[in-house]
């Protein structure tokens, strides 16, 4: 089992360009974390909506995308290829993320990223689908398997401005529909 941090602000990640992303710098802002993949059926929808949310709350929301290849091998690019895949393939059309993408990682199993170990400990299942599990066992390519595992690409975790994990959303929950919860956390009129 992975080490679980005591606080969200103790965590960090490495961006696609190799810079350390220290979560301590996010104090006072809401944070949306989503495991992403550039070759998934909902890539265009979810990446576009992540950009939209980041643009709507440019100073009060931090959006972090964590590329992961554990679900149907739908992020098979190397770190240095991911941005070009997004720009030219899917979503394509010159797409550029307005949020931070970190280096490819695992979100489940023995080698899960510490961010996901922490978030799954605090939010063990999506609030909109508490029974969500991987539906086809042939896609489970990690060990050990846990009830709190991320079930597929584009699960989302929303963290409040005080660093408290607030809510987890399933892959079927549209990213843009998180906006009312972001406003609630930021105390913005809905």
UniProtKB/Swiss-Prot annotation:
GO terms for molecular function: glutathione peroxidase activity; phospholipid-hydroperoxide glutathione peroxidase activity. GO terms for biological process: response to oxidative stress. InterPro entries: Glutathione_peroxidase, GPX_AS, GPX_CS, Thioredoxin-like_sf. It is found in: Cytoplasm, Cytosol. The active site is at residue 40. One of its GO terms (cellular component) is cytosol. It catalyses: 2 glutathione + H2O2 = glutathione disulfide + 2 H2O; a hydroperoxy polyunsaturated fatty acid + 2 glutathione = a hydroxy polyunsaturated fatty acid + glutathione disulfide + H2O; tert-butyl hydroperoxide + 2 glutathione = tert-butanol + glutathione disulfide + H2O; cumene hydroperoxide + 2 glutathione = 2-phenylpropan-2-ol + glutathione disulfide + H2O. Keywords: Cytoplasm, Oxidoreductase, Peroxidase, Selenocysteine. It is an enzyme of class 1 (oxidoreductase). Its EC number is 1.11.1.9, 1.11.1.12. PROSITE patterns: GLUTATHIONE_PEROXID_1, GLUTATHIONE_PEROXID_2, GLUTATHIONE_PEROXID_3. Belongs to the glutathione peroxidase family. Catalyzes the reduction of hydroperoxides in a glutathione-dependent manner thus regulating cellular redox homeostasis. Can reduce small soluble hydroperoxides such as H2O2, cumene hydroperoxide and tert-butyl hydroperoxide, as well as several fatty acid-derived hydroperoxides. Cannot reduce phosphatidycholine hydroperoxide. Homotetramer. This is Glutathione peroxidase 2.
């Amino acid at each position: 089992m992975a080490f679980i941090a005591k606080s969200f602000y103790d965590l960090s990640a490495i961006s696609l360009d190799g810079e350390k992303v220290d979560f301590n710098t996010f104090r006072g802002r809401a944070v949306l974390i989503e495991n992403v993949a550039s070759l998934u059926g909902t890539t265009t929808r979810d990446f576009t909506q992540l950009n939209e949310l980041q643009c709507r709350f440019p100073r009060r929301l931090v959006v972090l995308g964590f590329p992961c290849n554990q679900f149907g091998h739908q992020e098979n690019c190397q770190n240095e290829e991911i941005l070009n895949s997004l720009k030219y393939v899917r979503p394509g059309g010159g797409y550029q993320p307005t949020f931070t993408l970190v280096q490819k990682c695992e979100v489940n199993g023995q080698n899960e990223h510490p961010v996901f170990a922490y978030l799954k400990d605090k939010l063990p299942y999506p609030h909109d689908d508490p029974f969500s599990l991987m539906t086809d066992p042939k896609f489970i390519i990690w060990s050990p398997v846990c009830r709190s595992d991320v079930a597929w690409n584009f699960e989302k975790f929303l963290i409040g401005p005080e660093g408290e994990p607030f809510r987890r959303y399933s892959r079927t929950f549209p990213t843009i529909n998180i906006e009312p919860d972001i406003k609630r956390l930021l105390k913005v009129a809905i």
